[in-house]
Amino acid sequence: MKISEKEVQHVAHLSRLHLDQDELASMTEQLDGILSYMEKLAEVDTEGVLPTTHAFSKTNAFREDIVKDSLSQEESLANGPVQNGTAFQVPRVI
């Protein structure tokens, strides 16, 4: 599939991208290469190949949840410069 500069310019406009003439030519060439490769992939016979979501078997390594002692609330709050009761006080961002 050949893509034209006009089509690339249209997509750039929809994406709110400004492309100068050099960028437009480069992008057209790159997209044309990508679409040509996609056409080659479409020609591959995948009949009888099971669909997969991962190239390898994905397994989760679960561990048992074990409750451990950690810092108390007072010890945790001691690490912050300003506390407000039971929480850190930070400057307003918005």
UniProtKB/Swiss-Prot annotation:
It comes from the Bacteria. It catalyses: L-glutamyl-tRNA(Gln) + L-glutamine + ATP + H2O = L-glutaminyl-tRNA(Gln) + L-glutamate + ADP + phosphate + H(+); L-aspartyl-tRNA(Asn) + L-glutamine + ATP + H2O = L-asparaginyl-tRNA(Asn) + L-glutamate + ADP + phosphate + 2 H(+). One of its GO terms (biological process) is regulation of translational fidelity. Pfam families: GatC. GO terms for molecular function: asparaginyl-tRNA synthase (glutamine-hydrolyzing) activity; ATP binding; glutaminyl-tRNA synthase (glutamine-hydrolyzing) activity. It is an enzyme of class 6 (ligase). Keywords: ATP-binding, Ligase, Nucleotide-binding, Protein biosynthesis. This is Aspartyl/glutamyl-tRNA(Asn/Gln) amidotransferase subunit C. The lineage of its organism: Bacteria, Pseudomonadati, Thermodesulfobacteriota, Desulfobulbia, Desulfobulbales.
